[in-house]
Every structure is written in structure tokens, then in C-alpha cells.
């Protein structure tokens, strides 16, 4: 009985270890160092220029294939512009300066079945330890502005969206006005026709008398 329990326990442990080693099929994002909301004045958005330190390893073996720390030179790129793998473009959104994350990236969001540079084999799941050092907001990235600045931004009455919406409102007003005018004319014509018919009937009755 004791042997059976030990065998069952061993099977469970082996299964658990095997499951832990099984590469994920979806992007996994873990926060290793969180920045307090009071200190996070800006978060990363698509279109921002980010400066980062990173270390990349293979999920299966843990072997390091690249690191900006070894070169002592941060990696600079534009988020969401296709300059990096999809796992980065998705996994680095909403990040604060000073924040550290761990990204586990499946092949379809990494380098696919082709691999890269002779150091990343095809179909490899990648692990990145990343730290955001600096954010330079994109030129037209309103979302990247501080909250107070967004609230103080004036409404542009010459913006295309404002002009289009105003044009639609004016067009709808003209259509409603024309429809109302046509209805008034139709009602007036009906009243005139009814009055004419009534007058004609009265004349016929007078002639009979």
C-alpha cells in the first residue's frame, strides 16, 4: 500500500515537472519589478520610442543568446512599428519607466520556424528579462501625454473629425427642414383642395334652388 502511494506521488511530481517545462502557446507577461502609481507618470504606448535593457534565453535549455547588458548599451526602438518581434510589441505595452518584466514568447510571436542568426533555432520559445529605461512619446501619440496635459489640450475646431461631424449635422438639419417644408406644402394643398370642393358643392346646391 505504501509503495502504491509513493508510486502515485512520484507520477504526480513527474507530471507536474513535465507540465512546467511545457512551452506556452500564448504570450506570458510577468511583472518582476512594479512601479508605484504615484511614481509612474507615463506608460508606454504604440508609437513611443523606448530605451531598454534585456537578456534573452531559450525556454527549453535556458541558454542565453543575446543581452544588451553584455554590451552595456540599451536597445532603442519604436514600439508597435514592427521593428521588433510581435511578442515585444504586445508584451511591452503599458509599461512604466523602471519597471521590469519577464516575457515568455511562443514561436509565432517570435522568430517562427525559421529562427534567427544561427543562435535561435526554428520553433523556439523565447524568454526575455526586460527593463524599461526611458520613454520618448511618439509625435502624434496623444495617449502618451500626462493626464493633466491631456485634459488641458484644447479642442481643435479645424480638425478633420470635427469638420466631418459638423457637416453631417448640417446635412441632417437641411434634410429634416426640407421634409418638414414639403409636408407643410402638402397639407396646405390638401386644405385648398378641400375648400375648393366645398365651394363647388355650395354653388351646385344654389343653382338647384
UniProtKB/Swiss-Prot annotation:
Its EC number is 5.2.1.8. Residues 178-207 form a coiled coil. Residues 190-209 are annotated as: Disordered. The chain crosses the membrane at residues 157-177. Gene3D superfamilies: 3.10.50.40. GO terms for molecular function: peptidyl-prolyl cis-trans isomerase activity. It is an enzyme of class 5 (isomerase). GO terms for biological process: chaperone-mediated protein folding. InterPro entries: FKBP2/11, PPIase_dom_sf, PPIase_FKBP_dom. One of its GO terms (cellular component) is membrane. It is found in: Membrane. It is a single-pass membrane protein. The keyword Oxidoreductase does not apply. Residues 47-136 form the PPIase FKBP-type domain. Residues 1-19 form the signal peptide. It catalyses: [protein]-peptidylproline (omega=180) = [protein]-peptidylproline (omega=0). Residues 200-209 have a biased composition (Basic and acidic residues). The keyword Coiled coil applies. Pfam families: FKBP_C. Keywords: Coiled coil, Isomerase, Membrane, Rotamase, Signal, Transmembrane, Transmembrane helix. Inhibited by both FK506 and rapamycin. PPIases accelerate the folding of proteins. It catalyzes the cis-trans isomerization of proline imidic peptide bonds in oligopeptides. Belongs to the FKBP-type PPIase family. FKBP2 subfamily. This is FK506-binding protein 2B. It comes from Rhizopus delemar (strain RA 99-880 / ATCC MYA-4621 / FGSC 9543 / NRRL 43880) (Mucormycosis agent).
Amino acid at each position: 500500500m505504501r509503495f502504491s502511494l509513493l508510486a502515485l506521488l512520484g507520477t504526480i511530481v513527474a507530471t507536474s515537472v513535465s507540465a512546467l517545462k511545457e512551452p506556452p502557446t500564448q504570450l506570458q507577461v510577468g511583472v518582476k519589478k512594479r512601479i508605484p502609481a504615484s511614481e509612474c507618470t507615463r506608460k508606454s504606448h504604440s508609437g513611443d520610442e523606448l530605451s531598454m535593457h534585456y537578456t534573452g534565453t531559450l525556454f527549453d535549455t535556458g541558454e542565453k543568446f543575446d543581452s544588451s547588458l553584455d554590451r552595456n548599451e540599451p536597445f532603442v526602438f519604436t514600439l508597435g512599428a514592427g521593428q521588433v518581434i510581435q511578442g515585444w510589441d504586445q508584451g511591452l505595452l503599458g509599461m512604466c519607466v523602471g519597471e521590469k518584466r519577464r516575457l515568455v514568447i511562443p514561436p509565432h510571436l517570435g522568430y517562427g520556424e525559421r529562427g534567427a542568426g544561427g543562435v535561435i533555432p526554428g520553433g523556439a520559445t523565447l524568454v526575455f528579462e526586460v527593463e524599461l529605461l526611458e520613454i520618448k512619446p511618439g509625435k502624434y501619440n496623444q495617449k502618451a501625454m500626462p493626464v493633466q496635459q491631456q485634459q488641458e489640450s484644447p479642442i481643435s475646431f479645424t480638425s478633420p473629425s470635427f469638420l466631418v461631424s459638423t457637416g453631417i449635422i448640417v446635412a441632417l438639419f437641411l434634410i429634416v427642414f426640407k421634409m418638414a417644408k414639403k409636408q407643410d406644402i402638402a397639407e396646405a394643398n390638401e386644405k385648398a383642395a378641400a375648400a375648393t370642393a366645398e365651394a363647388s358643392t355650395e354653388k351646385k346646391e344654389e343653382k338647384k334652388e
